[in-house]
Amino acid sequence: MIAVIVAGGISFLFVLFSTSIGVSYFKSKNIGQPIQEELNFHDHKKGTPTMGGVFIILGTYVGFILSHINFWTIGKGFKVELISINTEIFLLLIIGTFMGIVGFVDDYLKVKKNRNLGLKARNKLFLQTVVGCIASYYFFSLDYSPTFYLFSGFGFDVGFIKWILIIFLIVGITNSVNLTDGLDGLVAGSATVSFGGILIISFWIFRHPEYYSSLSLIHI
């Protein structure tokens, strides 16, 4: 647990400093958020730094890698050892990366074409759904139970609907930050609320494995 907390702290610092450097670089290159001409009341948001999600994803990888490296073993002292990687957690990281790529393309098109509209909404939603379908199919191939748990010890069989719910969850969580981000142009605020909620859920499950041994974010 201590290793995870330390890795999370280092990941946070990495995002903090890399974002600061990135924002300075983007400003020097005049890379910022374009504004729709008809929305004059949004003029104050013009030039807001964009593509900041890149640093969040990189920071996530830093934290993930550090949390899977053991630098100290009691009785053995300093010794670098690689901890086995949970394939489900790694897949979540890959899902986040692909969603990040979709967001990067969206921001890149905005900057490239100097307009507020990057990817069309239907194209973005389609790409996100494709990623969700791939993830859902993977978990389906692992022969997980189709039982949908409302809380520990209570659930009901929903059959194939569960895999549709997984797609809905993945796309929904992605857009809960993405759409809110568009209100002020900064992802940090909305992401903090979203990540904070996921952190609390994850910590609770970690502290109560006897109740949630058969559950994970994917199972829910």
Locate each region found by the language model.
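"…together with the soluble PPM/PP2C metallo-phosphatase catalytic core" -> "…together
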Residues: 1-217
